[in-house]
From Swiss-Prot:
It comes from Hepatitis C virus (isolate HC-J7). Residues 122-173 are annotated as: Interaction with APOA2. This is Genome polyprotein. The modification Phosphoserine is found at S53, S99, S116. Residues 2-59 are annotated as: Interaction with DDX3X. Residues 546-553 are annotated as: CD81-binding 2.
Length: 737
């Protein structure tokens, strides 16, 4: 038996390291420390055919062409960690168990899961797994699975479109940032707060409890378009607006508490970025905004009516205020930059260790943009406020509305069996629009309105009905009670249909809301141009509410002088509807239900309970509106502009408090550079520029201000939405499909 030691296996430790000849993909090599060019042959990376003289040389191993492969992380602490597709594997095993073939179908190179990332993996796993399961169904599995696969591909195409729309940045790093940016940059066009006083609703600037986002000791974050009103032991106090969604209890009372929150946010964002879990942190940050409950530190109410009557504002004052407040970009940047040296000392000695940690970490990483963002964020929440001016003085001007007496015809009201109509001697139903019927409307000089009080006695005020609540419903089966008359604003008309022209006296007016005259046709809709001379002449009035249909409702007069109406289905504002106590709303009934707008519930000429559309035959159809005042109106319905006149029942002595104001959804015309013309004792739900609040005139009921002065404070402060955006940016949130 040999005593020689057993030969050891060669490893890296017991092998002498000698310089090896290094070969390059192009054919060159290093021999003795000298690089030798390739002998001959094609370009880089292609092996040339040896010549005959070279055949005897040993054949070397061809080096593979180097490829740029994507680095995929294999551990949680590295970026690019792939999400585990447990749902996908589970669907695969479930399909294998259910499959009559015992095999799993293949998607090939077009598998949507190959292109999905992050949240898209979850969506595509569900859609593709569902398609796999459908393919395993016996007999019908092939067609059903094909349809399911097509749907999965469609979902993938939709996800790709969302990714493209949210930005084509590498890795889709800023998709959630851009989506959050779009969600908080836009301010609602109509952010009017509504208060419920058990008997009715009315508009106010006071924030409701649902509008309060977060409460601090001396500051409040709230939704735009309102001002917090606090009831402090019986004393009502309006807080001071600092930004459209930040209010403070007193000037300068803001910075300390908000700085603490920003300190924690910077610390959390830095940790998320360091651990490469920005995706999860960003999703948690966004979702937490919907579930975190703010501590109740104050007793907020809606009894102050803050900033409703702030006084008259001239055009010069508006221009000066715009220069001070609407162009603060350069001033804000300079103010932030000037505070950076001071912040360096204050951050260290003030104990803002979260900010210090974030600055140190991102500085070592070379992320100077994030360092600047942190400094600007801290500079924003640490800035002070300063007073720049006071309120403009109140001015009083007289009523400038033009009162139109309307037409004064030889018309009398006749009561027949409890129903009111005009006298037949005033009618000339055979006249057309170009003859005496139209001319007599304006030039006959006398109207006997002695029967109007009795005629209008069956009409009720809006306050006489019960308040509404819940979801609106349409009443398609309208049955009119005995006390309901078509000349009352609350009269719910029956659905429009086909009306025989023989029974109609004069033209038929329909409202889009602009008044239009409907001509006679046959039942197939072919115009006849005979104005009811033939038995087959009819008015085709059936239509749906605009913008899907032609008009809201129609009004005409029959041959005996009675007013007839038809219209779209009115709105039922309560589920427990009672015909005696409740209202079927055919107009804008805002004070009884905030959702009842004219566009949703309008069923005729009545724009509000006080105002109806003015048209040439208004005094024939509604003779008791002879003393109504005429106002100019501009409305947009389905993108189409309507300019019309409205006749309103309002006089100087009528009460007009906030709870008495109706809503008129219109695009008001201008009285001046700062004043809108609205219907009397109403308001437009378009808030004022710069404040987002309602500003009404103290004494004149048909004026609303289009521009409101801010509470005389210039502010340099970051909104809470921007704090969330900076957190997403600092944490590298990438939540895209």
């Amino acid at each position: 038996m040999s005593t020689n030691p057993k030969p050891q296996r060669k490893t890296k430790r017991n092998t002498n390291r000698r310089p090896q000849d290094v070969k390059f993909p192009g054919g060159g090599q290093i021999v003795g420390g000298v690089y030798l060019l390739p002998r001959r042959g094609p370009r880089l990376g292609v092996r040339a055919t040896r010549k005959t003289s070279e055949r005897s040389q040993p054949r070397g191993r061809r080096q593979p062409i180097p490829k740029d492969r994507r680095s995929t992380g294999k551990s949680w602490g590295k970026p690019g960690y792939p999400w585990p597709l447990y749902g996908n594997e589970g669907c695969g095993w479930a399909g294998w168990l259910l499959s009559p073939r015992g095999s799993r179908p293949t998607w090939g190179p077009t598998d949507p899961r190959h292109r999905s990332r992050n949240l898209g993996k979850v969506i595509d796993t569900l859609t593709c797994g569902f398609a796999d399961l459908m393919g395993y169904i016996p007999v019908v599995g092939a067609p059903v699975g094909g349809v399911a696969r097509a749907l999965a591909h469609g979902v993938r195409v939709l996800e790709d479109g969302i990714n493209y729309a949210t930005g084509n940045l590498p890795g889709c790093s800023f998709s959630i940032f851009l989506l959050a940016l779009l969600s908080c940059v836009t301010v609602p066009v109509s952010a009017v707060e509504v208060r419920n006083i058990s008997s009715s609703y009315y508009a106010t600037n006071d924030c409701s409890n649902n509008s309060i986002t977060w409460q601090l000791t001396n500051a409040v974050l709230h939704l735009p378009g309102c001002v917090p009103c606090e009831n402090d032991n019986g004393t009502l106090r309006c807080w001071i607006q600092v930004t459209p969604n930040v209010a403070v209890k007193h000037r300068g009372a803001l910075t300390h508490n908000l700085r603490t929150h920003v300190d924690m946010i910077v610390m959390a964002a830095t940790v998320c970025s360091a651990l490469y879990v920005g995706d999860i942190c960003g999703a948690v940050m966004i979702a937490s905004q919907a579930f975190i409950i703010s501590p109740e530190r104050h007793n907020f109410t809606q009894e102050c009516n803050c900033s409703i009557y702030q006084g008259h504002i001239t055009g010069h004052r508006m221009a000066w205020d715009m220069m001070l407040n609407w162009s603060p970009t350069l001033t804000m940047i300079l103010a932030y930059a000037a505070r950076v040296p001071e912040l360096v000392l204050e951050v260290v000695f003030g104990g803002h260790w979260g900010v210090v940690f974030g600055l140190a970490y991102f500085s070592m990483q070379g992320a100077w943009a994030k360092v600047i963002a942190i400094l600007l964020l801290v500079a924003g929440v640490d800035a002070s406020t300063q007073v720049t001016g006071g309120q403009a003085a109140h001015t009083v001007r007289g009523v400038a509305s033009i009162f139109s007496p309307g037409s004064r015809q030889d018309i009398s009201l006749i009561n027949t069996n409890g129903s009111w109509h005009i006298n037949r001697t005033a009618l000339n139903c055979n006249d057309s629009l170009q003859t005496g019927f139209f001319a007599a409307l304006f030039y006959v000089r006398r109207f006997n309105s002695s029967g109007c009080p009795e005629r209008l006695s069956s009409c009720r005020k809006l306050d006489d009905f019960r308040i509404g609540w819940g979801t609106l419903e349409y009443e398609t089966n309208v049955t009119n009670e005995e006390d309901m008359r078509p000349y009352c604003w609350h009269y719910p008309p029956k659905p429009c249909g086909i009306v025989s022209a023989k029974t109609v006296c004069g033209p038929v007016y329909c409202f889009t809301p602009s008044p239009v005259v409907v001509g006679t046709t046959d039942r197939q809709g072919v115009p006849t141009y005979s104005w009811g001379e033939n038995e087959t002449d009819v008015f085709l009035l059936n239509s749906t509410r605009p913008p899907r249909g032609a008009w809201f409702g129609c009004t005409w007069m029959n041959g005996t002088g009675f007013t007839k109406t038809c219209g779209a289905p009115p709105c039922r504002i309560r589920r427990d509807y009672n015909g005696t106590l409740d209202l079927l709303c055919p107009t804008d009934c805002f004070r009884k239900h905030p959702d009842t707008t004219y566009l949703k519930c309008g069923a005729g000429p009545w724009l509000t309970p006080r105002c109806l559309v003015d048209y040439p035959y208004r005094l024939w159809h509604y003779p008791c509106t002879v003393n109504f005042t005429i106002f100019k109106v501009r409305m947009y319905v389905g993108g189409v502009e309507h300019r019309l006149d409205a006749a309103c029942n309002f006089t100087r002595g009528d009460r007009c408090r906030l709870e008495d104001r109706d809503r008129s959804q219109q695009s008001p015309l201008l009285h001046s550079t700062t004043e809108w013309a609205v219907l009397p004792c109403s308001y437009s739900d378009l808030p004022a520029l710069s404040t987002g609040l309602l500003h009404l005139h103290q004494n004149i009921v048909d004026v609303q201000y289009l521009y409101g002065l801010s509470p005389a404070i210039t502010r340099h402060i970051v909104k809470w939405e921007w704090v969330i955006l900076l957190f997403l940016l600092l944490a590298d949130a990438r939540v895209c499909a």
